Design a protein with these regions (language model features):
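Short coil/turn segments at secondary-structure junctions
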Residues: 1, 61-64, 180-187
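Hydrophobic single-pass membrane-targeting/anchoring helices
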Residues: 2-34
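N-terminal "mature-domain start" segment
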Residues: 28-98
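Short cysteine clusters
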Residues: 73, 104, 190
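Sec/Tat-exported extracytoplasmic proteins
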Residues: 77, 85-88, 108, 200-204, ...
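Extracellular/mature segments of secreted proteins
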Residues: 79-84, 111-115, 167-168, 197-201
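Short, solvent-exposed recognition patches
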Residues: 83-150
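A short, solvent-exposed beta-edge/loop patch
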Residues: 138-208
Length: 208
């Protein structure tokens, strides 16, 4: 049976995408979405028919990067945001759907992309490698730290990277298409999420 924490985390990914879109539409007075307007109700995400990933494990962390007390909107520097084509001001919010995790949305006006960083402080990133999660995963690294690329069934316009930063903590990076025509391929979005994760870890390492 799927644990309550895991079920809420999976649901939070779909809900976070709606929140990120809403922030992009309202924070600067300029519509970010030119197509695929967000639904008025929460999306239903189904998890069926994907292979289990229980045999995959994360590599050891080189050190620990505690996220407790970190402001997610200050993780990426202005120069890093420029390099990632995220040219708007970071917008903080609290993910009320998942234990009030601190999160930050940053959009790219020219690139038509949106990035979201969220700090999960009550479980480890390896929760995504459980077959209970029923998502498509690929283990990677982010500036030397173990990470997982997560593709959620039914959500092709976004990609997540979960960085194993410390025991029972991880950095969740969401990178999504902001309504481009044609839409950005998910493979490209996953590469974008990895770039954001790399930059975020690089910045966090300077704080420790």
């Amino acid at each position: 049976m799927r644990t309550p924490h895991l079920a809420r985390l999976i649901a939070a990914i779909g809900i976070a995408i709606v929140i990120v879109i809403g922030v992009a539409l309202t924070s600067g007075g300029r519509p970010m979405i030119t197509a695929n307007e967000p639904p008025t109700t929460r999306p239903t995400v189904r998890f069926q028919g994907l292979p289990p990933t229980t045999t995959v494990t994360l590599t050891p962390r080189p050190t620990s990067l505690s996220l407790d007390g970190v402001n997610p909107c200050t993780i990426l520097s202005s120069s890093q945001r420029a390099d990632l084509s995220l040219d708007s001001s970071p917008t903080p919010y609290t993910d009320a759907e998942f234990d009030k995790a601190k999160a930050c949305s940053i959009r790219g006006l020219e690139s038509g992309t949106v990035a979201r960083l969220a700090l999960v402080l009550n479980m480890g990133a390896d929760v995504w490698l459980s077959d209970e999660a029923q998502v498509q995963t690929q283990t990677v690294t982010a500036d030397g730290f173990p990470a997982i690329v997560v593709r959620t069934p039914g959500l092709t316009d976004a990609c997540n990277v979960e960085v194993d930063t410390s025991d029972n903590e991880f950095l969740d990076v969401l990178f999504r298409d902001g309504g481009n025509t044609p839409p950005i391929p998910q493979d490209t979005l996953c590469l974008g999420a990895q770039r954001v994760a790399e930059a975020a870890v690089s910045s966090l390492k300077l704080r420790h």
